[in-house]
Amino acid sequence: MYGKIRISAEIEIKTGMHIGGSNAYSAIGAVDSPVIRDTLTKDPIIPGSSLKGKLRTLLARSISQSIILEKHNNDHDSIKRLFGSSGDKIGDKIIKSRLIFSDCPLKNKDKLKEVGSTEIKFENTIGRIDSVANPRQIERVIRGAIFDFKLVYDIDNKDELEADMKNFAHAIKLLQMDYLGGHGTRGYGKVDFSIIDIEVMENCINQDEKAKIIEILRDVG
């Protein structure tokens, strides 16, 4: 049995978020640490790779019996089948990720037009020994920005579907208690998820199974 589930959601930024982009060609006086942006629209985005990496790490930590995480190829099987495994050496089994992430574009650009979608936060570190100040400017996506989240789950084994959805939902809940992007321990990157739509393709599961999946995911937010 094979099919796909498409999950649509909104990610609302609750505190300024910084996911860094390139400043290789910044002019003199430019922001020290800009956010990553869509090349075409110039709007900030949340890269799918950032989401995938953060969710995998949080889920691995919640399952791991050790404080220090193993290499990702040594993750629990329930994590590897969701996020994939490339293998460390020739002959290792390669596991394709069942979760297919996409970059998340800014959704409420028009609402933010007057104030802008980002802000510049001025920070300063002071050396304990010499008391020398090191000022810096960090660009952040502002509180209230909403991003369009799309994810596809490949149904490779229907017997594992419910467990996979529970693990995915658990990872989302962990993220909402953690942070996305950098500088999270200083208050950056708090986010909320709101599931908008769950679409099952190919009619690969019945209505009762679909209702169960919806129940699991609706509990996220």
What are these regions (language model features)?
Residues M1-G221:
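RNA-binding basic/glycine-rich loop and surface signature characteristic of RAMP-family CRISPR effectors
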